[in-house]
Amino acid sequence: MRRSQLFLLAAWIFFFLTLCPPTARAGHPEQQADNGAGTFSLQNERVRFTVVVENGRLAADRLEAKPGWSKAEGGASPAAVETDADFGLEVMVTDWSAPGKVNNAENPVVLTKKDFTFIGRELKELPEGRQELDLDFKAKEISIRLRLAYQLGAEAFYVRRSLSVSDLEFGHHFLRWFWTRRGLVSGIGSVLKNGGFGQPAAALLDGGGVFFGVEYPAAENHLDMREGRAEILCGQEYGRLIGADGLTSDWVVEGLTPNSFVKNWFFRYLDEVRAAPLRPFSLYNTWYDLRAPEYPDWPPDKVMSERTALRMVDILRRSMIEKHGLKLDAFVLDDGWDVYESDWVLRGEQWPRGLKPLAEELKKTGTALGLWFGPTGGYSFRMKRVNWMRAHGYEVVGRDKNNARLCLAGTKYGALLKKRVTDFVADDGVGYYKWDGLQFSCSEPGHGHPLDIYSRRAVMESLADMCRAVRRENPSIFLNITSGTWLSPWWVKFANTIWMQGMDYGFADVPSLSRREGAITYRDFILYDDFRQQDFWFPLANLMTHGIIKGRHESVGAAAEPLDKFTDDVLLYFARGVSMYELYISPDILTDGEWTSIAQSMAWARDRFPVLMNSEMTGGNPLKGEAYAYVHFKGTRGIVAARNPVMEPARLEVKLDPAVGLDPGAGGLVLERVYPTCRVWPRLYRAGESVILPLDGFETAVYELYPVQEAARPLLAGATFDVISEQGKDCLVQYYGVEKGAKLLNPEIIESAVMGGKSVNAGALPLPEDEEPSLVTGMAVRPEGAGRPRFTVRFNLSETGREGALALLMMPDPSSAGGPKPSLSARIDGAAAAVKTEPQEGRSQWFTIDVRPGKHEIAVQARPGRDSQEWIGKVAVWLVAKQKQPTKEISFRLKAEPKPGPRPPKVWAVGEIRKNVKLGDISLNY
């Protein structure tokens, strides 16, 4: 048969097939629209969604708020958003010429709504009150069928849309990208968030707002204003042939908000699509305590094994569970449990009976066994694992230690890893995984997956399949997927937590008095970069921030460090709003005070988790030494965890913001500082107001916000206080630091009050203003001659001061910055004194000298650093000490017995505070 005859025959077959209606889905007969036109709707009590088809072509869609819902949520008028409903299919067409193209090789092509004709629709009622509208189309020039599916939940304020394509006739066209939304949006007032890789796009509307995004971590979502028009583009790469079985995109969400709090509504939506509900989850991790025997000079009693693991379980049970009543959700074996030269096989010598004896022992306290996996090969001795896997036929990329890794999308290795993680859940009761180290690209041929950008999807799908597989075995398993992830909010469809970015720990280039202070600042800068500079929309509660670190083999603090500084780190870790409470500790080296700090902080965080789970970072840049805070609001309650990363005192303004979750109508709110000391502000606040929080140098402070009528304890406002005892209805309070206007905010709960042995009126307590005693007097800082590197500091430290230190901050002039740092020596009252320093990578550095109460003269000698002939700069001189304050007492008898909940730890003695007093500045030039 001639080529021309073949072409005519193929054309007649194609024409006949296009006249045939599409096959209806089983159980759902197809419904044909009249004259290729129609208006189709989905609606619930909150929103109405409408799709318009005109002249056989998809025309527009509209999502609008219902007046009742809009009014109930404080919207000025019902919001609405309309799009042209367009989409894009980027296809490599296998044909003589692609639709709309002239030349044979002119490919690929993007098929949009103009390339398809409407042929029918179907409306479905789904479980839980959900509705689905399916619209069917056929391509005008090639044999592709398209289905647009829209879903609306019973109480949803968002509609989801997906694209499905199939080819029952040819099956050789290649789908490059699904652009699930691609077109114009009307009604946009201003763009709040342009979107990006894995990020949602969001905008304000008249009366509310809107957000868009593909429910897939590796998708692209973009919303831009061009020449006064808003354009939306949401899509994902695919890389598959379009065949009879069809290909379906992930859902793209379009959410409508009834007010301007778009981000808050987006997080509400996220709670409805996450794989697992947010919950506190505490764990111990062996990484800084137990490791593999291959580690050089590793102590035999710290080699990971059944024996050493059971010993740690016993210590944790006694120190944490029995003594403090805390729950430990998981005991996690980090790197070291498997044979490095194997396909993830347990070490038989260290675990002769397998993992079941450990898992059974953990069950006695309701603790799950957890395991670490390094999907691409791990870190320690990774080349042993990678080379063994390569030799045994598993897919590997690269050959040297810097780039060699296992391919998670490889046919053989992907199947192996899925089987291993599933078997450990089924056979050993594993209830937690830490999957650490991922790579989302591989262009090695022969691995059984698409190459180039499509390998990203192959790895993502392999990982998602692992997540689904282990959740089928144990729906409550906790999945922590770490290095290699990015802050797309749609990771919560698969994982409980992902990595915050940055290093496990680090030390910020901000002058710090201790390593732990520097580590706190580093961690908070990483989060500042995530949430303030990069503007990632991601729930902080779903981040792994690498928990409390104090191990025998690694610690971010000194072996013997001040308890209050350790507790600052511990409490702030929980108060950021994380849900995974990680203990990277050696349980047998912690002091009783450190255990108490961990236990009380964790108990407080668990109790306050419904509020803490809603987090927003505010304030300045930690790396610039600016004060900052983590704010949490829900309903009428709030928590603010604030910190000042430098010695100079600061004031931080925090808005009581409905946009972050505070009830817009909330009023009569108490502001109480609950750490490091207790103090209630004398006035009541309401939503929308701002509060000014004073922060001393290097202070971490935690505040709670709640309605005054919910307080069950006496609220002594305008004074710092300690509750000494609570027995039944009796409450004894000691107080100091009284300011003008101090009073009891809730006298109505008091039956009687006694001060100085006399009954007093609780509504008019005699609380005269007082002054704090001086910590230091007679201060003087003097140079010893011009241009000489010596100076003298004189002061008298009060007998009420303890743990005093003279703190010297050396700040180089820009001309001296970057060179070797100077060293200091000192003499106190003529005797040589020890000078301690905290090594600092930045420009400035702290030196400290311990001092006792009394009058002192300290001579300080500065010497240039190695190979340095000159140092120009300034020295800030501070006196740091704790001081006991004179206190008074009030005894209260309450009308009802309170039921006090957990509170943050107390790290200072009653009436004691830490003070920083600046003695002066001095310039040095030598």
Predicted regions mapped to residue ranges:
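Active-site-proximal substrate-binding groove within the catalytic cores of carbohydrate-active enzymes
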Residues: N44, L63, A244-D250, L463-R679, ...
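Beta-strand-rich recognition/accessory modules
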Residues: A33-G36, S41-Q43, L168, F178-T180, ...
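Aromatic- and acidic-residue-enriched carbohydrate-binding clefts of CAZyme catalytic domains
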Residues: P277-P280, Y284, K327-E361, R382-K412, ...
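An acidic-aromatic substrate-binding cleft motif
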Residues: P258-A330, D334-D338
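Active-site-adjacent "subsite" loops/lids of carbohydrate-active enzymes
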Residues: Y284, Y288-T308, A368-D428, S514-R515
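Acidic, contiguous internal or C-terminal segments within carbohydrate-active enzymes
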Residues: P29, V53, L126-P127, Q131-S186, ...
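C-terminal beta-sandwich/jelly-roll accessory domains of carbohydrate-active enzymes
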Residues: S615-E626, G635-R637, A642-A805, M811-E870, ...
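Acidic-aromatic substrate-binding/catalytic surfaces of carbohydrate-active enzymes
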Residues: A37-D136, I750-L775
